[in-house]
Curated annotation (Swiss-Prot):
PANTHER family: RNASE ADAPTER PROTEIN RAPZ (PTHR30448:SF0). This is Nucleotide-binding protein CYB_0992. Belongs to the RapZ-like family. NCBIfam families: PRK05416.1. Keywords: ATP-binding, GTP-binding, Nucleotide-binding. It comes from Synechococcus sp. (strain JA-2-3B'a(2-13)) (Cyanobacteria bacterium Yellowstone B-Prime). Displays ATPase and GTPase activities. GO terms for molecular function: ATP binding; GTP binding. It comes from the Bacteria.
Length: 327
């Protein structure tokens, strides 16, 4: 077992678990410093590292001034071989966590907590790209978080986290996508009245879409690219890759392709046998699904016999929309 690095720097979204991560690292013997502006990290580390076996530092990134200091810090930690960890979680999970703890959001809540969450995610996207490690805490309890952190600080190889994101071009392109596919040329279920109110998660809609040869060919090309690119991303020790698929609204075509990819890549998530992708951790995010459903509801009215989408905004993600559900 390799020696734990003396320093771990942590950034992340509000509600993603930075405080909990610090607590878990303290139990692993780390001395912690919380809410430190990036410009103060280097002098603090140089002053403290001779007196402390290991340091865990979480950053204060609320102000643009502090975020502008990250490139200098990122270059330094890379030169020192120090892990720079970004903690994140799906937006519905952050919404539930912050609501349950009645915790104010640093980006304000005048326009709503959901908007504050999305504003912070956008603001921290450049910071996220500077990090060396990423950890989605959406489905982790305290013990699992500690295990992940322990694996990181002990240098245990981690799986490549492949985040599959569906989105709607009408709502904007995900700013953190490494690979992006435009599938607006595929048959549009919106123009099929019996499919319009469904989503790409519904078997009936998937059956309609994948009956089309162009859809099948497009899907196979994307799947083949993932399998072909994966060894090269692993070779450069990239721990996180975001693949985004977009259609017009992010409710039908892109969602269906992401769901099928997650299903077909699932066998590769567990190390076994001769699997081509033995250490791939697949995560799914339907970024604009809920936005699109709300728009359809406003245009055509709620589906008879069902509660309005606006009343389901917390329930829907838990029923299978694993990420910032919007269109």
């Amino acid at each position: 077992m390799s020696v734990a690095p003396p320093v771990l720097v942590i950034a992340g979204l509000t509600g993603a678990g930075k405080t909990l991560a610090i607590q878990q690292l303290e139990q692993l013997g780390y001395t912690s410093l919380e809410g430190i502006p990036p410009a103060q990290v280097i002098p603090l580390v140089e002053a403290m590292r001779t007196h402390h076996a290991a340091l865990a530092i979480s950053l204060n990134l609320h102000a643009q001034e502090y975020r502008d200091q990250v490139p200098t810090l990122a270059a330094w930690v890379q030169s020192q071989g120090i892990p720079f960890l970004f903690l994140e979680a799906r937006s519905p999970v952050l919404l539930n966590r912050l609501s349950a703890h009645r915790r104010p959001h640093p980006y304000g809540e005048a326009a709503g907590l959901w908007e504050a969450i999305e504003q912070e995610r956008l603001a921290l996207a450049p910071v996220r790209e500077r990090c060396t490690h990423w950890l989605d805490t959406s489905d982790l309890n305290a013990q699992q978080l500690r295990q992940q952190l322990q694996a990181l600080v002990q240098g245990i190889p981690q799986p490549l986290n492949l985040r599959l994101v569906s989105f709607g071009f009408k709502y904007g392109v995900p700013p953190d996508a490494n690979l992006l596919f435009d599938v607006r040329f595929l048959p549009n279920p919106f123009f099929q009245p019996h499919l319009r109110r469904l989503t790409g998660q519904d078997p009936l809609l998937q059956e309609f879409l994948f009956a089309d040869p162009i859809t099948q060919s497009t899907y196979q090309h994307i799947l083949s690219l993932i399998k072909a690119f994966w060894p090269h991303y692993r070779a450069e020790r990239r721990p996180h890759l975001t693949l985004a698929i977009g259609c017009t609204g992010g409710q039908h075509r892109s969602v269906a392709l992401v769901e099928r990819l997650a299903q077909d890549l699932q066998p590769w998530t567990v190390p076994a046998g001769n699997h081509v992708l033995p250490d791939l951790n697949v995560q799914v995010q339907h970024r604009h699904l809920l936005d699109s459903q709300r728009e359809l509801e406003a245009r055509f009215g709620p589906v008879p016999g069902e509660a309005g989408v606006a009343q389901q905004q917390v329930r829907i993600p838990l029923a299978g929309v694993p990420a910032p559900s919007h269109a």
